[in-house]
From Swiss-Prot:
Molecular function terms from GO: DNA binding; DNA-directed RNA polymerase activity; protein dimerization activity
HAMAP family, A to Z: RNApol_bact_RpoA
Recorded GO CC terms: chloroplast; DNA-directed RNA polymerase complex; mitochondrion
Name of protein: DNA-directed RNA polymerase subunit alpha
One GO process term, biological-process aspect: DNA-templated transcription
Species this chain originates from: Crithopsis delileana
Location within or outside the cell: Plastid, Chloroplast
Keywords, comma-separated and alphabetical: Chloroplast, DNA-directed RNA polymerase, Nucleotidyltransferase, Plastid, Transcription, Transferase
SUPFAM superfamilies noted in UniProt: C-terminal domain of RNA polymerase alpha subunit (SSF47789), Insert subdomain of RNA polymerase alpha subunit (SSF56553), RBP11-like subunits of RNA polymerase (SSF55257)
Length: 339
């Protein structure tokens, strides 16, 4: 963090992107400015955003690979230049882009001799490769080579115990951190009592999202983190009061969900994830905190279950219902069956 004195004028608090560039497929850069801030506020915002950007942004990566009958990760496979460990490290570096949650399966199945790159990975429709030229292995002989992969969306750095699994699969330390680096600097402007601060924020990402998208998600996460304090008085009310306040007078939310479940019989609801429903970030995060990742999970919740979710409010319930009616009308059943 750098602090400097510069001349400047005060105006309404605003932010903008002052520089944006793509250095490579796996390196995006963005520079943002927020001003004017009162003395001390720039540090507060800068520290919070840096932590949120580096630790709270979700990413998609390969978490497991199955080679078949390979005794251990230090083994070599005939006809392949790299060892199993080197292949695992190459798979760890693959950058993926996806907005869906849960575990996904992928695979590689090729015949040598040839180079294997990220382009050879057979992915589900919801996942995209950022750089298809990333190397994986080099087949030096005419052999059939197949790997089963597991893909997961998460946040932070996840490690697993190194052990031999009975099915021949090996864990890959998941680095679900799309933001590679964050720097911020603070500049002072004005004179005397009119001094203000300008915050400059630099963000580097791995290409799975842009710096602007990362900044938006980090800001949204920080807002959601402080929401319970804004509604502390509301949550302090008795459950009976909340129940009365949340229940519509003529047609309860639970009855509407029950009718929706009956009408949607036969749809693979466990294949429809809630991030496909265009929920607001607040409503979406409430549902995720209650372990409702799919539409089936959401419809399995009773009204009481929803009311017990932290920060869940009446507008969230109305928004969920309106969104379900919008995306799952009766006349679209056939289309939904094609998921």
């Amino acid at each position: 963090m750098v602090r400097e004195e510069v001349a400047g004028s005060t105006q309404t608090l605003q932010w903008k992107c002052v520089e944006s560039r793509v250095d490579s497929k796996r390196l995006y850069y963005g520079r943002f400015i927020l001003s004017p801030l009162r003395k001390g506020q720039a540090d507060t915002v800068g520290i919070a955003l840096r932590r949120a950007l580096l630790g709270e942004i979700e990413g998609t990566c390969i978490t497991r690979a199955k080679f078949g009958s390979v005794p251990h990760e230090y083994s070599t496979i005939a006809g392949i230049e790299e060892s199993v460990q080197e292949i695992l490290l190459n798979l760890k570096e693959i950058v993926l882009r996806s907005n869906l949650y849960g575990v996904r399966d992928a695979s590689i199945c090729v015949k040598g001799p040839r180079y294997i790159t990220a382009q050879d990975i057979i992915l589900p429709p919801s996942v995209e490769i950022v750089d298809t030229a990333q190397p994986i292995a080099n087949l030096t002989e005419p052999i059939d080579f197949c790997i089963d992969l597991q893909i997961k969306r998460d946040r932070g750095y996840q490690t697993e115990l190194r052990k031999n699994y009975q099915d021949g699969s090996y864990p890959i330390d998941a680095v679900s951190m799309p933001v590679r680096n964050v720097n911020y600097s603070i500049f002072s402007c004005g004179n005397g009592n009119e001094k203000h601060e300008i915050l400059f924020l630099e963000i580097w990402t791995n290409g799975s999202l842009t710096p602007k998208e990362a900044l938006y998600e980090a800001s949204r996460n920080l807002i959601d983190l402080f929401l319970p304090f804004l509604h502390a008085e509301e949550e302090g009310a008795s459950f009976e009061e909340n129940k009365n306040r949340f229940t519509p007078p003529l047609f309860t939310f639970q009855k509407r969900l029950t009718n929706l479940k009956k009408n949607k019989k036969g749809i693979p609801l466990n294949c429809i994830f809630i991030d496909q429903l265009e929920l607001t970030s607040r409503t979406y995060n409430c549902x995720k905190r209650x372990x409702x990742x799919t539409l089936l999970d959401l419809l399995s919740k009773t009204e009481e279950d929803l009311l017990r979710i932290d920060s869940f409010r009446m507008e969230d319930r109305k928004h969920i219902w309106d969104t379900l009616e919008k995306h799952l009308p009766i006349d679209l059943l056939k289309n939904k069956l094609s998921f």
